[in-house]
Amino acid sequence: MTEKFDYKELGLKVGLEIHRQLDTKKLFSPVPSELTEKVDFTFERRLRPTMSELGEIDPAALEEFKKGRKYIYEGNYELSDLVYMDEEPPRGPDREALEVTLQIAYLLNAKPVDEVHFMRKIVIDGSNVSGFQRTAIIALDGKVDTPWGSVGIPTICLEEDACRIVERKEKEVIYRLDRLGIPLVEISTTPDIHHPEQAKVVAKYIGDALRATRKVKRGLGTIRQDLNVSIKGGARVEIKGVQELDMIPLIIEREVERQLNLLKIRDELRERGVRPEDIKEEFYDVTDVFENTESKIIARTIKKGGNVLAVKLPKFRGLIGREIQPGRRLGTEMADRAKKYVKGIFHIDELPNYGITEKEVNAVIEKLGLGELDAFVLVAADEETAKKALREVIKRAREAIEGVPEETRRALPDGNTQYMRPLPGKARMYPETDIPSIFIPPEEKERIKANLPELPQERVERYVKEYRIDKSLAETLVNDERDELFEELVKKGVKPSLAASILVVVLKGLKKEVPIENITDDHIREAFQLYTEGKIAKEAFEEIFKELALHPEKSAAQVAEEKGLTLLSEEEVERIIDEVVQQNIEVIKAKGMGAMGMIMGRAMAKLRGRADGKLVSTLVRRKIQELS
């Protein structure tokens, strides 16, 4: 397969940051680390940034503060105590969380520190009530070997997760406290990844090490993968929230494409002779041009007493509409910046459109005194809001002349990315004074190192050898994190081949029909218990799981009863087979054992899920032989 880019020539550098929730108690309070929809109380806060010890303010924190938002927190008495309301000093940290992180460190060839010191990382988007996140380095200097070469893991950290967002409004954000404080392991690599597929290999290896502990949470939102991507002449861009492993190569490829196109735009702007200082912060009121406009957005704004303001972007015509990622343009980047104040912008390269006529476009060009290569951007809002939005556009336009801006971006489902905020600075960390340093005795390190869990690939090989199941089944069990449940079922007497087949083949087969994520491990345990007690046939699993996926509040026993899936006695099975045989007696007399397939099919149509297939086959064979 031909690659889209020569990544070596482009000097691609990628670093990973992987965050995974640990399945222990909360990090600084002995409350369960679970999520809930039950809300017992609410309170509100406003947050502001503080200077670091060097008198600096983190730019990302400052930008968040400028939004002037109020934060409302929803809490539950069982899952949120005074520690996470920031009304009481932290306790802990949780020893199990610390031990699991040390296991992960050894699995990734890292060296644990002798003493753990927690720090405070400034976060004032409201996701931490205190305005900071507690984090500590647990190990240093790990590595992952890949076919492309080794990738370093400079740090493995243990930190607390943030609140869960419920609703975001213009001047108010509602958070739920339940997720705040769940232990989170953060693993950072060096930027020694030079190919998109290499990034996927490294992420998978780290994910395997995490899952090997069997103490990480599963499900949506429990793992977050961030990428740091740069190319020669470009800039370091942090891409947050990559959910799927398979999306990593595409997201990197799209970021390379974006940076290359931004560099081409930079070169063209320089050829046109434009400099950042040529873009003036001058706002033109062009409301009169749109007095009788057909644009619904603009007409609605003017009717409310708003304005239409414009800025002039010298020598930008034809470049704002230039595609930089599939379906995204430089104008999209400008709009992303402006969206903290307005819903969108209009620019010359996309007009006439959206109800704006050519006559109106020409009137704006004339009013601004634009030359042939000059562009404009419009915003419809109240005057102050419009100016704030256009200042963001001006800032992004100036950055376009410089090349690729350093920033934090959000991963989108299609592989593209979207602006989130400036890249965080270093002025956001300071010591945590409420938690004493924690000494890790050498004997504790040795104990953990001597009892490391097996890695997923080792587990796959063991399953094939010990349980004699197909390798692809074993790999799917491990990759889908059903391996622990599989071993539990086998210990209870379920045949390994049946347990693996139900957990992999049956559940995967239902994925396109029903939401199988609603089927819990307890549902599965109960269904297998019914089977081992002889109450259901193995053919009943599919029907039971299908119903449980749609109605997870039900039990497996309840579904089996409602759907008539409980096993019939041997006498009842024989009676139904006798009926089928009598209905087809002439065919049996004519074909003898040649009628076996037909009779078996008709019998199973009546008995599927209510009788064991082997028993039905034995009885049908006997009945046919008696008549032949």
Curated annotation (Swiss-Prot):
Q: Does the keyword ATP-binding apply?
A: yes
GO biological process terms, semicolon-separated: glutaminyl-tRNAGln biosynthesis via transamidation; translation
Output one GO MF annotation.
ATP binding
- PROSITE patterns linked to this entry: GATB (PS01234)
- Keywords from the named record: ATP-binding, Ligase, Nucleotide-binding, Protein biosynthesis
* Residues of the signal peptide: none
Write down the superkingdom of origin.
Answer: Archaea
Give the matching Pfam families. Answer: GAD (PF02938), GatB_N (PF02934), GatB_Yqey (PF02637)
- Please provide, in alphabetical order, the Gene Ontology terms of the cellular component aspect for this entry: cytoplasm
Recorded catalytic reaction(s): these are:
L-glutamyl-tRNA(Gln) + L-glutamine + ATP + H2O = L-glutaminyl-tRNA(Gln) + L-glutamate + ADP + phosphate + H(+)
Tell me which family the UniProt entry assigns to this protein.
Belongs to the GatB/GatE family. GatE subfamily.
Tell me the subunit arrangement. Answer: Heterodimer of GatD and GatE.
**What name does the UniProt record give this protein?**
Glutamyl-tRNA(Gln) amidotransferase subunit E
Species source reads: Thermococcus gammatolerans (strain DSM 15229 / JCM 11827 / EJ3)
Classification lineage? Archaea, Methanobacteriati, Methanobacteriota, Thermococci, Thermococcales
